[in-house]
A protein has these predicted regions:
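Sec-dependent N-terminal signal peptides
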Residues: 17-28, 33
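N-terminal Lys/Arg-rich, disordered targeting/topogenic segments
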Residues: 1-14
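Short, solvent-exposed mixed-charge patches
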Residues: 326-327
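Ser/Thr/Gly/Pro-rich low-complexity, disordered linker/stalk segments of secreted
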Residues: 54-119
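Active-site beta->alpha N-cap acidic-glycine motif
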Residues: 107-198, 202-203, 213
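Intrinsically disordered, low-complexity regions enriched in serine, threonine, proline
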Residues: 10, 52-53
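Catalytic domains of cell-wall/extracellular-matrix polysaccharide-remodeling enzymes
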Residues: 147, 180, 193-323
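Sec-dependent signal peptide cleavage junction
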Residues: 32-49
Length: 327
C-alpha cells in the first residue's frame, strides 16, 4: 500500500469511528429520554394508577371492541393499592331482608334437579356443602377475565367481577359473557373514586352511573357494591341502598404481582363462606386464579358468586356491609 493510500485509509477509519461514536451517543440519549418520560408516567397513588391505565388503553386503541385483544403489557398499574390497606373487620350481619340474586335455572326442568341440589348459573349447587366466593376488582379486562372464566367454568364454578363503570364499554363482549354464563357482575363505582372523600350526591352518582353502564349491556344492574379501597364512613353508608360486599381474604395481588403468593394466601386462609379479594388487571392474578380454582375444588369447595353465597348463608340486606358469609 502506498503512503498516500495508507493516509486515506487512516482518515476513513477515523471518520468511521467518529460516526459510530455519534450514533452510540444518539442511541444513549434516546433511551435516556424514553426512560425519563416513562419515569414521569409512574403513578403516584391509586387514583393516578387508574388514570394511567386509561391513558395507555386509549393510546393502544383499546377504547373499543378491539381492546379485548390487547396485550396485558402496560395495564398492570392499577387503583387497587388502597384495597390491600383495608383491614379485615368483624362481619356485620344483616338478615332482615333477602335481596340476593334470583337463582338462575339450568336448561333441565326442576324435576331433573338432583335431590338436595339447587339449579343456579347453569350448574347445580349443594347448599349444605362448603362454598367460597372468588371476587375480582377493577376490570373488566378481557385478557385476564376470560382466562378466569374459562377455568371457573371448566370446574363447574362461577365468580364475581366488581367492574368499574367507565371501563365496561371497552369490553362489552366480556361483560356479555359474564352475564350469559352465570358469573356475577358487581358495582365498583363509575370512576373508582374513594367514596369516603365525596359528598352525598357524588356518592350516589358514582354508584348509579356504574349500575346504568352495566345495565345498558346486560339489561340488569348489579345487585351488590364494592367500595374502592374498602373506604367508608357514615355518609357512604347512608347513600348506598344496595348491599355492600367487602372481603375477609385479601391476596394483596396488587402489591406482590406474584401468583405463588396469592395462591398460598388463599389456600392458607380460606374457609367455608369466605369472600376472596383479587384483581382482574394483572396477569399474575390470572395465573393465580387458574391454580386456586382447581385446588379449592379438590378440597371440596364449591365456587359460587357473592349472591349465591349469600343466598345460602342468610341473604343480603340493602345498605349493610358484609365481609364474609361464614356459617
Amino acid at each position: 500500500m502506498s503512503t498516500d493510500q495508507q493516509g486515506i485509509w487512516e482518515e476513513n477509519r477515523k471518520t468511521w469511528k467518529m460516526r459510530a461514536a455519534a450514533l452510540l451517543l444518539t442511541a444513549v440519549c434516546t433511551v435516556g429520554a424514553s426512560f425519563a418520560a416513562y419515569a414521569d408516567d409512574v403513578p403516584s397513588g391509586p387514583a393516578s394508577d387508574m388514570e394511567l391505565i386509561q391513558r395507555r388503553e386509549q393510546a393502544s386503541g383499546s377504547q373499543n371492541e378491539a381492546g379485548d385483544a390487547q396485550t396485558a403489557a402496560g395495564s398492570e398499574n392499577h387503583a387497587g393499592a388502597a384495597e390491600g390497606q383495608q383491614t379485615t373487620e368483624n362481619q356485620e350481619t344483616g338478615n332482615n331482608g333477602q335481596t340476593a340474586s334470583e337463582t338462575q335455572g339450568t336448561e333441565q326442568g326442576d324435576s331433573q334437579v338432583p335431590d338436595g341440589m339447587v339449579a343456579s348459573g347453569g350448574r347445580y349447587i349443594d347448599p349444605n356443602a362448603p362454598m367460597v366466593a372468588l371476587t375480582f376488582d377493577d376490570g373488566p379486562y378481557a385478557p385476564v377475565g376470560n382466562r378466569i372464566m374459562d377455568c371457573a367454568e371448566q370446574y363447574g364454578g362461577r365468580v364475581t367481577f366488581y367492574v368499574v363503570g367507565n371501563r365496561v364499554n371497552s369490553y362489552k363482549s366480556e361483560i356479555q359473557r359474564m352475564y350469559a354464563n352465570g358469573h356475577e357482575i358487581g358495582n365498583h363505582t363509575q370512576d373508582h373514586k374513594y367514596l369516603q372523600k365525596l359528598g352525598a350526591q357524588e356518592i350516589r352518582q358514582q354508584v348509579e352511573a356504574c349500575n346504568q353502564a352495566v345495565a345498558a349491556i346486560t339489561g340488569e344492574a348489579p345487585k351488590t357494591v364494592r367500595l374502592p379501597g374498602g373506604g367508608k364512613n357514615s355518609t357512604v353508608l347512608a347513600n348506598i341502598s344496595q348491599p355492600i360486599v367487602l372481603w375477609n381474604v385479601d391476596t394483596l395481588d396488587w402489591k406482590t404481582r406474584n401468583a405463588a403468593s396469592s395462591v398460598q394466601t388463599v389456600l392458607n386462609q380460606v374457609k367455608d363462606g369466605s369472600v376472596v379479594l383479587m384483581h382482574e388487571l394483572y396477569n399474575a392474578s390470572g395465573d393465580a386464579a387458574v391454580t386456586i380454582i382447581p385446588a379449592l375444588v379438590e378440597r371440596g369447595y364449591q365456587l359460587v358468586t357473592v349472591s349465591e353465597l349469600a343466598q345460602f348463608r342468610g341473604g343480603l340486606a340493602g345498605g349493610t356491609v358484609y365481609y364474609s358469609f361464614h356459617k
